[in-house]
Amino acid sequence: MRIGEWMRGLLLCAGLMMCGVVHADISTVPDETYDALKLDRGKATPKETYEALVKRYKDPAHGAGKGTMGDYWEPIAISIYMDPNTFYKPPVSPKEVAERKDCVECHSDETPVWVRAWKRSTHANLDKIRNLKSDDPLYYKKGKLEEVENNLRSMGKLGEKETLKEVGCIDCHVDVNKKDKADHTKDIRMPTADTCGTCHLREFAERESERDTMVWPNGQWPAGRPSHALDYTANIETTVWAAMPQREVAEGCTMCHTNQNKCDNCHTRHEFSAAESRKPEACATCHSGVDHNNWEAYTMSKHGKLAEMNRDKWNWEVRLKDAFSKGGQNAPTCAACHMEYEGEYTHNITRKTRWANYPFVPGIAENITSDWSEARLDSWVLTCTQCHSERFARSYLDLMDKGTLEGLAKYQEANAIVHKMYEDGTLTGQKTNRPNPPEPEKPGFGIFTQLFWSKGNNPASLELKVLEMAENNLAKMHVGLAHVNPGGWTYTEGWGPMNRAYVEIQDEYTKMQELSALQARVNKLEGKQTSLLDLKGTGEKISLGGLGGGMLLAGALALIGWRKRKQTRA
């Protein structure tokens, strides 16, 4: 070994002994993630952990980029903000080369609200965190800051004894702790989840662990889904999203499927408030509406009403772990229930998922009593028993499961009827006016595409009705049950609307059968070389099936009478 190499090795060892090696054994990140990344959780440094996470995060084979249907669509102007890693390019103006303070000065004039929000943020006030006293309920933030600085030292972005002065524009939009100037037309980036993960490694790793723990026993959903970690992948791998030419409509879906790409859906820029993200309203923008009305169901539940009535008395700044004990919280919130897993609070919100919102997905209901599902049910019981007895919790969760299965059975009966019509070729226009959907979608019955694309009689009205019964009404029934909103699964939403859809489907099916019987009767009569207008026998004047047959028969009899009168006069 050469002397120079030997000296460098000696100095490195000495440095490590002096400052100690920081390991990233993050207790809230499950073993499955360390295994998937091929890391030893007891030895991996923050740098090694971060690099392994980012390598997977940016790998097209693991969901990055345009996806497998990328040839069928092109980004529009707004797309650069939906998936910055793939599409964002720095602006061509202003042609400025600026340092840290210049960003704030310029944007105070150009985008003043951004700057005001940032000045209120923890990012802009790190010394306030350092000065917190141990009896302050926010004291935990001091430990978080120290963890962030240790991460940055491991990554070589902060000196051994250096502290982070602030997190300003240049840190997120160029590079953390950048000392020199940046070219506005070359160096600017739009922050993505891995940008935030540079400092917030724990939270990034927790969120990314959804890929490893959301694995269904029989492949009911693709691995890692549904989740925040792969919600953009789920979006662009949806056939109709890639197929539809109305790209502005498609990007409406994207706007709620960008948690994979960035963190500001929950932590709004440029304040990035943890307190804001703990409030139920932070979830409402996306977890609402006709196919997943979680917000509506929660707010109309007793849980939601308690939160609404008492929220002004709660300290939203305390960490979730302390919300009930130190923050005055006395009712569940979205975060309190869904971010909790067996006593820990993390950004992995899928470890208790059992129904995944859509009970009609093949294999979901069949799996609900499996050991996999029962273990997750037990984890939910632990969540619920923070406020309820175990007997009550298990009783209610049993009601939820069985109520969902009852709704599923109602849908399945209706779906079987419409599917038979499809197989028989008797849906409206099925043989005469049913254009194929745009590529890459393939023709089929009751496919998700038909909620967002239509042409001619594709889909038929009954086909769309039973599809909405599954995607919307059954989903809302389950959500109402899961969020303890009685009207949300019995009357206003769920069972009531499903019952109406069922009745309408049965009505149309019966009319179709009667019309078919009428057609068969007419065909039979024509086969006797007898015109319908020449009916004479009483047996041939019987009802031919429903209103249509009756009207046709009445018209025929009137014409027969007219012919007889004409013959008599002649």
From Swiss-Prot:
| Binding annotation for heme c 2 | 169, 172-173, 270
Where does this protein hold heme c 7? 334, 337-338, 483
Give the cofactors, semicolon-separated. Answer: heme c
Assembly, in brief, is: Homotrimer; subunits are linked by two covalent bonds between Tyr-491 of one subunit and heme P460 of an adjacent subunit.
Q: Which UniProt keywords apply?
A: Heme, Iron, Metal-binding, Oxidoreductase, Signal
Q: Where is the signal peptide?
A: 1-24
EC number(s)? 1.7.2.6, 1.7.2.9
InterPro entries referenced in this protein's UniProt entry, alphabetically = HAO, Multihaem_cyt_sf, Multiheme_Cytochr_ET
UniProt name for this protein = Hydroxylamine oxidoreductase
Q: Which positions does UniProt annotate for heme c 6 binding?
A: 228, 283, 286-287
Q: Which gene encodes it?
A: hao1
State its location(s).
Anammoxosome
Gene Ontology annotations of biological process type: anaerobic respiration, using ammonium as electron donor; protein homotrimerization
The cross-references to Pfam families, in alphabetical order and at most eight, read: Multi-haem_cyto
Q: Where does heme c 3 bind?
A: 123, 196, 199-200
State how the cofactor is bound: Binds 8 heme c groups per subunit. One of them, heme-4, is an atypical heme c (unusual heme c binding motif CXXXXCH) and is called P460. Catalysis takes place at heme-4/P460. The other c-type hemes mediate electron transfer to the external electron acceptor, which is a cytochrome c-type protein.
What is the taxonomic lineage of the source species?
Bacteria, Pseudomonadati, Pseudomonadota, Betaproteobacteria, Nitrosomonadales
